[in-house]
């Protein structure tokens, strides 16, 4: 595995990351927590240190899986997470459907 330094830090991030959308949402088949954690731990064993998550991936499930898989390894992984789609108020709409209205103003 190749790694890169992350700007002005001591972090070494794998060039390949593992996105957790597919194991968190159930849109491409169901993954039990045990299956998802095993996959994530295998990726780590193969050198992957970057994991892509979001609060909307399975309504927070991706971040819960990270906790289960890497409870004692937190200082050895990098989590890229994000916010944006509001599934709480707009249901579990998928990309490709009509755009969900967003309001990123300070008053929102």
Where are these predicted regions, by residue range?
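N-terminal binding-site loop/beta-alpha segment at the start of enzyme catalytic domains
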Residues: 1-81, 85-93
């Amino acid at each position: 595995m190749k790694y890169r330094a992350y700007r002005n830090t001591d972090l070494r991030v794998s060039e390949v990351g593992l996105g957790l959308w597919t194991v968190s949402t159930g849109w491409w088949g169901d993954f039990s927590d045990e299956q998802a954690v095993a996959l994530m731990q295998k990726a780590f064993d193969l050198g992957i240190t970057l994991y892509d998550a979001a609060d909307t991936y399975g309504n927070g499930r991706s971040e819960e899986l990270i906790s289960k898989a890497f409870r004692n390894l937190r200082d050895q992984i990098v989590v890229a997470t994000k916010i944006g789609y509001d599934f709480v108020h707009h249901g579990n709409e998928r990309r490709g459907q009509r755009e969900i209205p967003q309001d990123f103003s300070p008053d929102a």
